[in-house]
Every structure is written in structure tokens, then in C-alpha cells.
UniProtKB/Swiss-Prot annotation:
It catalyses: an aldehyde + O2 + H2O = a carboxylate + H2O2 + H(+). It is an enzyme of class 1 (oxidoreductase). It comes from Vitis pseudoreticulata (Chinese wild grapevine). It holds the Pfam family Glyoxal_oxid_N. Residues 1-19 form the signal peptide. The gene is GLOX. Its main location: secreted. This is Aldehyde oxidase GLOX. Catalyzes the oxidation of aldehydes to the corresponding carboxylate by coupling the reaction to the reduction of dioxygen to hydrogen peroxide. Substrates include glyoxal and other aldehydes. Involved in disease resistance against the grapevine powdery mildew E.necator. Is sufficient to confer disease resistance to E.necator. Can produce hydrogen peroxide in response to E.necator infection, and this may directly play a role in the defense mechanism during plant-pathogen interactions. InterPro entries: Gal_Oxase/kelch_b-propeller, Gal_Oxidase_central_sf, Glyoxal_oxidase_N, GO-like_E_set, Ig-like_fold, Ig_E-set. Its EC number is 1.2.3.1. Induction: Induced by infection by the grapevine powdery mildew E.necator. GO terms for cellular component: extracellular space. Keywords: Cell wall, Oxidoreductase, Plant defense, Secreted, Signal. GO terms for molecular function: aldehyde oxidase activity.
């Protein structure tokens, strides 16, 4: 079923939209939120002019560029969330369909791309809104194998595994490990005539192994021995990865952290890409599996409508926002139609058949090359959409330079009296450490609050690389002073549960999150 916003009754649908930047200068293909209240937005080179100039004297000279050998336009920018102002950044080589991940020190690792960027490794060391930090291309190291459409995942020791890519059915690491790239036959086995194994979904399980999903199959992979520990049953419903991608999340880790549940939703019908069929309806099925079970099976459920290129965003509450994308076609340039304006809320703890809620629709088509990222204030930043090889504004689905924010229902004004405010919390905690969080709430707290850690992933191509939500073990919430409460929290026991790095720490009261404070988790 293809849903038309014009014929749907819109009364009482939850959520609100706001335009925060009318012209970012670039269409963001890749987006990441830093601990300084800024957002890195990244497109690609070899496309000619963007709509944001580099500072005078900072032009990029690249004899290999296919369009501009002397390029004075920015293809990356940084957004200050406090002022909504944009500052241009400079990238040197092509980051088209590349991958990324934050490192334990808070720097953003960015790998691969196309053409002269396919083996490059870049870093962005974030700074405050008044700083002048910029991209750095590493000169002393590069990828062993060119990586285009790969996926990055931080590991328990803080290193990063880089999985797959076009004509790269292998894995490698940053920092580089002895032996270079290691073949992963699973990626070759699931490749079909239209690929469908690119940008694989990679989740770090609490047992330390990786859940790797590509096309319609998944394995549990022990990267330390390069062995497949478990082959999961195939997921019904067609391919799920680029160029047929839906999206995927690992649900919140909680309790004793031993159970990990993976959800995969949406995707294109097989053949839509290779036939260049823009009107083939996307499928709306979702599969949910307990990846740590000794006998895992997929539990199937259906979204209210089909979706290709949706983004699944873990909210601070443990619910999942599904947003962006189209209802027909596939990924690729000008290969989709029927924008999917309606977000969905997936509520994991509801019974099967009652987990999806349709939310207030947007008005801006967010098609191929769109992104969605959780912000520290609980909103979700929506950026990008460029279903064309170059920037093209006179089109049915134009290159999109606007940045929006979607506010879930928990940010509504009628929740203000139960919304917690974190007054005190540590800036750094060690694995397994007990620590206090002090919060204020206007109305008396009933029961216990949650304290949840949310990673800052690298969002691109309908998958947030490194996305993670960990619900901390907490003591009963006890009064400390007027409208103030003390929560004794225990940090995750190790990097298998939450790899070292910076996390947004939210207090959640009756399903309403605070504004997050950043905390660094260290061994």
C-alpha cells in the first residue's frame, strides 16, 4: 500500500516539525553529532559547485577531480545547534558513499569513498562552536582495500572494524592490524546480480561477536578468529541492503545485558534496482530476532506501509523512530518515487501487532542520501536528500539543502512537569563504576527513573553505524532536596556492552527524557 498524505486524516497525530536551517549549502549524505553541540554534515566531491563557498584562500586543487580541478566550494559543513549557524569545512578527496565512526577520544574516523578517496582515512577532531577544527586526511596510513559502501563499527577495545564495500568482501581495522584485509566469504555468498550486500548492517553483540546482516541473511561473526559462529535463518520479504535497503537497529541493552534483539524493517523488491523501476512498491515487513538466542527465529510484523531508504533512530526511551525514505523504487540516482512523509514510532515493548504508531507527516521529500540523527535535546535532526548525480533543484525531488528537526511527543509542552533536568553528573566514568546522577523534576517522581546512554552514530544510507542505547542499572530514585532526586547508577561492565567513548546520558521519567549530558566511558 502506498500512503498519500493528501488523503489521510491528520488530526491528533503525534510529533512536530521545525525548519532550523533554510540553506545548509550542501546536501548531507553523512551526518554525525559531536559532544560540543555541533553536527558534522558531509557530502562528496566530483559534483561541481555546492551552495557554500570555502573561505578565501582555501580552495581545493585536485587534478583528478572530474568537474572542478580548482574547487572553491565546501562539500562538508558544521552546524552549531545553539545558533543554527553553518561553517564550511574542507575535504580533500571524494567521500561519496563512505563510512565512519567516533573513536574513544571523541574524534570522528571517516574511511573510504570513491575515486581518489577510496582508500583514504580521514579524521575530524571536534571543537567548540567558536573553534576552527577541520577535516584532516591521514598521510601515514590508508586502507588496505578500497572501501566504497562499507560499514564501520567500534569494537570493545576502541578499535574500529570496517566491513565490506563494493568489490571488497572482506574486513579490516583501524588502527591497521597485521595481515591487512581479511576475507569474509559470507559477503560474497549473499551478493546477487544487483549486489544487495553493500552497507551491511553491523551490530556489536553483548557477547563480543558481531551480528552482520547483508541482503536477506545474517551471521554471528567472531572477528578475533575470523569464524562464523552462527548462521541465522534467512529473513523473508526480499533484499534489505543497498541498493534495496530498509534499515536496522539493535534494541536497547538492559538488565544483565545478555540479550540482544535486532530489528530490520523495509526494503525494495528484488529487481526494482536492476530494472530501474521507480514505481515498484517497497515492502513493509519487519523482522525481529533475538540474536543471542541459541535457537534464533525471525518474528515477522508489518509496518502500516512499505518503505525504502528509511532511517531507524534509537530514541532515549528505547522506542525507535522510523523516518525518511520512499514508498516505491530502490536506492540510486532517480530510482525512487512516492516520498514517505509519515514517520513511524516502533514501540518494542508493545504486543505484536500493536508496536507501530503513525506520526505527523513532514512536507519535504527525504529520498536517496538523507540522514536522521538523535540530538542531545531529544529531537531528531533530518538532513540531506539528493537523488541526482549533481545538484539539481528543478526536479520533482530536488537536491535538498534544508535541515529540519522532528520532535517526538515526549517533547510536548504538557510533559514539562514530568520532564527531568540533570543537575549534576560526572563527565567521565569507568566500566562497572557506581556514580550519582542528580535530577530535578517539577512533579513528584513516582517509581524509578531510567538513566540511558545513547551513542552518537555515523548516519548514512539508511543505517546509523555504531548506534547503541544502553539502559543503566539504577537504584530506586530517592529525594535529595525540593524537586531534586538522586539516582545511583552503575556503568556498563565493559566494552562489549558499551565500547569506550562519549555518550549522551539521558534521565528518563515516565517516558519523558531530559536534555542529555555527555559522559565519557573509559576502561
Amino acid at each position: 500500500m502506498i500512503l498519500d498524505a493528501a488523503i489521510v486524516a491528520l488530526a491528533d497525530l503525534p510529533g512536530t516539525w521545525e525548519l532550523i536551517v533554510p540553506n545548509a549549502g550542501i546536501a548531507s549524505m553523512h551526518t554525525a553529532v559531536t559532544r560540543y553541540g555541533t553536527v558534522v554534515l558531509l557530502d562528496r566531491t566530483n559534483i561541481g559547485p555546492s551552495r557554500k563557498m570555502l573561505p578565501k584562500g582555501h580552495c581545493r586543487y585536485d587534478p583528478k577531480d572530474e568537474v572542478l580541478k580548482r574547487d572553491c566550494y565546501a562539500h562538508s559543513v558544521i552546524l552549531d545547534l545553539n545558533t543554527n549557524k553553518i561553517r564550511p569545512l574542507k575535504i580533500l578527496t571524494d567521500t561519496w558513499c563512505s563510512s565512519g565512526q567516533f573513536l574513544p577520544d571523541g574524534s570522528l574516523l571517516q574511511t573510504g569513498g570513491d575515486l581518489d578517496g577510496v582508500k583514504k582515512i580521514r579524521k575530524f577532531v571536534p571543537c567548540g562552536p567558536h573553534g576552527f577544527c577541520d577535516w584532516e586526511e591521514l598521510k601515514d596510513v590508508e586502507l588496505e582495500t578500497g572501501r566504497w559502501y562499507a560499514t564501520n563499527q567500534i569494537l570493545p577495545d576502541g578499535s574500529v572494524i570496517i566491513v565490506g564495500g563494493r568489490a571488497a568482501n572482506s574486513v579490516e581495522y583501524y588502527p591497521p592490524r597485521k595481515g591487512g584485509a581479511v576475507q569474509l566469504p559470507f559477503l560474497s555468498d549473499v551478493e546477487d546480480k544487483q549486489m544487495d550486500n553493500l552497507y551491511p548492517y553491523v551490530h556489536l553483540l553483548p557477547n563480543g561477536h558481531l551480528f552482520i546482516f547483508a541482503n536477506n541473511k545474517a551471521v554471528m561473526y567472531d572477528y578475533t578468529s575470523n569464524k562464523v559462529m552462527l548462521e541465522y535463518p534467512p529473513l523473508d520479504g526480499g533484499p534489505r541492503n543497498y541498493p534495496s535497503a530498509g534499515s536496522s537497529v539493535m534494541l536497547a541493552l538492559e538488565g544483565d545485558y545478555s540479550m540482544a534483539i535486532i530489528v530490520v524493517c523495509g526494503g525494495a523488491q528484488f529487481g526494482a534496482f536492476i530494472q530501474k523501476s521507480t514505481d515498484t512498491p517497497a515492502h513493509g515487513s519487519c523482522g525481529r530476532i533475538v540474536a543471542t538466542s541459541p535457537h534464533p527465529v525471525w518474528e515477522m510484523e508489518d509496518m502500516p506501509f512499505g518503505r525504502i531508504m528509511g532511517d531507524m533512530v534509537m530514541l532515549p526511551t528505547g522506542d525507535v523512530l522510523i523516518i525518511n525514505g520512499a514508498q516505491a523504487g530502490s536506492q540510486g540516482f532517480e530510482l525512487a518515487s512516492s516520498p514517505c512523509f509519515f514517520p513511524l514510532l516502533y514501540r518494542p515493548n508493545q504486543p505484536l501487532g500493536l508496536r507501530f504508531m503513525t506520526l505527523t507527516p513532514g512536507t519535504v521529500p527525504r529520498m536517496y542520501h538523507s540522514t536522521a540523527n538523535l540530538l542531545p535535546d531529544g529531537r531528531v535532526l533530518i538532513a540531506g536528500s539528493n537523488p541526482h548525480y549533481f545538484y539539481k533543484f528543478a526536479a520533482e525531488f530536488p537536491t535538498e539543502l534544508r535541515i529540519e528537526a522532528f520532535s517526538p511527543e515526549y517533547l510536548f509542552a504538557d510533559k514539562a512537569n514530568i520532564r527531568p533536568v540533570i543537575d549534576e553528573s560526572p563527565e567521565m566514568v569507568r566500566f562497572g563504576e557506581q556514580f550519582d546522577v542528580f535530577v530535578s523534576v517539577s512533579l513528584p517522581v513516582v517509581g524509578s527513573m531510567e538513566v540511558n546512554l545513547a551513542s552518537a552514530p555515523f548516519a548514512t544510507h539508511s543505517f546509523s553505524q555504531g548506534q547503541r542505547l544502553v539502559k543503566l542499572t539504577v537504584s530506586p530514585t530517592v529525594p535529595d532536596a525540593d524537586e531534586r532526586y538522586r539516582i545511583v547508577c552503575t556503568a556498563p561492565p565493559g566494552g562489549k556492552i558499551a565500547p569506550p567513548g562519549y555518550y549522551m546520558m539521558f534521565a528518563v521519567n515516565l517516558g519523558v527524557p531530559s536534555v542529555a549530558r555527555w559522559v565519557q566511558l573509559v576502561p
